[in-house]
Each structure stands twice: as C-alpha cells, then as structure tokens.
Amino acid sequence: MSTSFENKATNRGIITFTISQDEIKPALDQAFNKVKKDLNVPGFRKGHMPRTVFNQKFGEEALYENALNLVLPKAYEAAVAELGLDVVAQPKIDVVSMEKGQDWKLTAEVVTKPEVKLGDYKDLSVEVDASKEVSDEEVDAKVERERNNLAELTVKDGEAAQGDTVVIDFVGSVDGVEFDGGKGDNFSLELGSGQFIPGFEEQLVGSKAGQTVDVNVTFPEDYQAEDLAGKDAKFVTTIHEVKTKEVPALDDELAKDIDEEVETLDELKAKYRKELESAKEIAFDDAVEGAAIELAVANAEIVELPEEMVHDEVHRAMNEFMGNMQRQGISPEMYFQLTGTTEEDLHKQYQADADKRVKTNLVIEAIAAAEGFEATDEEIEKEITDLASEYNMEADQVRGLLSADMLKHDIAMKKAVDVITSSATVK
C-alpha cells in the first residue's frame, strides 16, 4: 500500500491510498461467490457458473463494486494508521482508478481531530453554588414530607381550602362546544397541585360539596393541543366531596411507621441527617468536578472545532436518548405526542450543548495524552466488573459490547478528570 496526505485546510485534507492486487484478488473471489448464487444462466445450474464464463459474459469489472465494499474498510483504516492521522468524521471516498490487473487507487476526504493547546488544568481555584452542610430545617422538611405521605384524606363539611382534595365531575367547552379530553367524572383534584391549567384550581377554593361551579379559564398560548391554545374555555364543575388531609402526630410512633429500623423520632432525624450529608457530599463533589472541568476547558484553546464533530455529537446524544425511551416502551412518535414537541425541537435542544460537550471531551483527551495515561489489564478488568455489576450483566456481555480500546479510552479519561479535580480548591 502506498499512502499520502495533502492538507487542504485546518483539520481537513485528502488521503490518497492504493489497494494492492494481493488484497483485490481474494476480494474478487468473495464477490464472485456471493453473486453467482443468484445467477441463472442457460447451460448451467443456478449458482454453478464457472468464473471464466462469468468474466467472458459480464466482465470482471462487474465484480469491482462488491469487491471494493469488502476490501475498502480495512484498506482505509490501514491508510489512516500508516499516516498517523486522528480522523473524527466519516470520510468522503472517491475512486481514482480501478484498472484490471493493477492496484486500485482511491482518495478519502477526511476531517481530523483539531489541535488542543492546553492551559492550566491543575491546582485550579473554583467557585461552586453548593454546600456540604445540612441544616435542621432540611432534616425537618424531609420528616414532614414523609409525614405527609402517611396522611389520610377524610371527608369534611364546609368550604374547600388550598391543599384540600375535591372529587369532581367537569365538562369543558369553547364557545359552547365541548372538546375532546375536556370531560372527567369522579376526578380527585388536590387544590394547589397545579394539575390543571392556571386559574382552574383557584376557582374551586371556597366551594362546597353539592355545588356546581362555572370555572372560566384561558388555555396557555403554548398549550400542547394547538386547537385550544390561547382560547377561553368554560368548565361546568360539580363538586361531590371535599376531603382534607389528616396528618399523623409528630412523635416516636410516626418515626416507627416511617422507618421500621428506628425506635424514636430523634433516631429517624439522625438517620435522615446522615443520608442528606451523604447526598450533599456527592452533589458538592460533582459541582467541584463540573466547575474545575469547565475552567480547564476555558483555559485551553481548540484550533477550529470542525462542525462535523458537533453534528455527530448531536445525533449521538439524540440516538442515545431515544434508545433509552424505547427501552422504556416509549416510541419516538409517542414521546413527541406526549411532550408536544417535534424531532426538530429535540435536535435544537441537543444542539445547544453539543459544542460544549465536544470541546470538553477534546480537552480531557488532550490532558490524558499530556499526562501519558494508559490503562493496565487490571484496570480494564475492574472496569468490566464494575460495569457488569452496575447494569446487572455478565462480564462477557460487557466485553462483547465494549472493545478493549473503548475501555482503555474511558479509563484514561477518568484519570484525566481526577487530575483536574483532585488538585482543585474551592474559593
């Protein structure tokens, strides 16, 4: 193989490479064995035409396209490796010459990874909007949330108040015409929960069981049902019951009902304090890591970020997100219908952060390279074991999904992140 690289612009160039006859001949044999199965030529059983007859009838050139598809990926990868290029997008391949008995000559228009000029990434001083401290109020708030979860609804006489639950029938109409989805029977609605459109729940405060209330509202301009967006509507609402929350007493019995591992309210609060401290510690460390990485990226200079890298990142993120949705049984069509969004909206959402994500990855990779980080066999095995445990998979399944190169890359990236964050201090 002969190879050359011609630089055309920053991070862009053309590879010229050849594919030798030693590679072409077996590829032509494979291509012939593939196509002959479907050949039905008079004088020969289907799939049994000799190669010489095929060449006479169709010409060896008829196999070139299939043969090229077989040999091209390996040849292109070998050319990139020989030239020591770091290619970051799909190449544009063109055939220069494919003459019988001669090496094939091709070109590949490629985009290469941009140069990263690192700035300071160690001993960084960062500011974070996070704290490890847990206040008594935060502990009490957690207890109160659990206490409210054990509250029981009891029917009450008198007017409905904010926080009460009303059991209602309702029929909605616009200009006197009922609309789809605007009707409900025996619906339990907590006043103040924000379940219904703005203004609806407030108009039921002060109502009593047995009353019928005309609730007049205006649908928001951005309402997902476009035929209703911005329109005035009336909901004829009948109140069947008004229920209020009866919360249990704040005592040791409540603590035992919430958590069978404790005996007193003080024990419950102590347990919650430890849980909150642990969660806050993780959140604080994450905040420091994020701030330190962001500063390291800001201190670096990336020479002309190729738009192809950003484009690929957008589609990678979108595909990952939609794949997660489908694993939960939600198709793309269902997701867009439920959220009132479009594929274009999702694309814009990921586009906004793609540039930042690509730059961050490039800088972390550059730090890993500058530090000479590599992964040992022991580290790779530990990573496989950890991933298998995290995703409830067998180790061999992980090995089948992730190549050794991917695992080595991830481990080196983690080491680079650790270098940035372990030396960072908080202002």
Curated annotation (Swiss-Prot):
Q: Which UniProt keywords apply?
A: Cell cycle, Cell division, Chaperone, Cytoplasm, Isomerase, Rotamase
Q: Which residues form the PPIase FKBP-type domain?
A: 163-248
- Reactions catalysed, as given in the entry: [protein]-peptidylproline (omega=180) = [protein]-peptidylproline (omega=0)
GO BP term (any one)? chaperone-mediated protein folding
Stated EC number for the protein is: 5.2.1.8
Taxonomically, the superkingdom here is Bacteria
GO MF annotations, alphabetized: peptidyl-prolyl cis-trans isomerase activity; protein folding chaperone; ribosome binding
Check the record and name the Gene3D superfamilies matching this protein: 3.10.50.40, Trigger factor ribosome-binding domain, Trigger factor, C-terminal domain
Give the subcellular location. Cytoplasm
A cellular-component GO term for this protein? cytoplasm
Free-text comment on this protein's domains from its UniProt entry: Consists of 3 domains; the N-terminus binds the ribosome, the middle domain has PPIase activity, while the C-terminus has intrinsic chaperone activity on its own.
Q: Which family does it belong to?
A: Belongs to the FKBP-type PPIase family. Tig subfamily.
Function field: Involved in protein export. Acts as a chaperone by maintaining the newly synthesized protein in an open conformation. Functions as a peptidyl-prolyl cis-trans isomerase.
Q: Which HAMAP family match?
A: Trigger_factor_Tig (MF_00303)
Name of the molecule in the record: Trigger factor
| Organism (species) | Streptococcus agalactiae serotype Ia (strain ATCC 27591 / A909 / CDC SS700)
**Lineage start:** Bacteria, Bacillati, Bacillota, Bacilli, Lactobacillales
Which gene holds the coding sequence for this protein?
A: tig
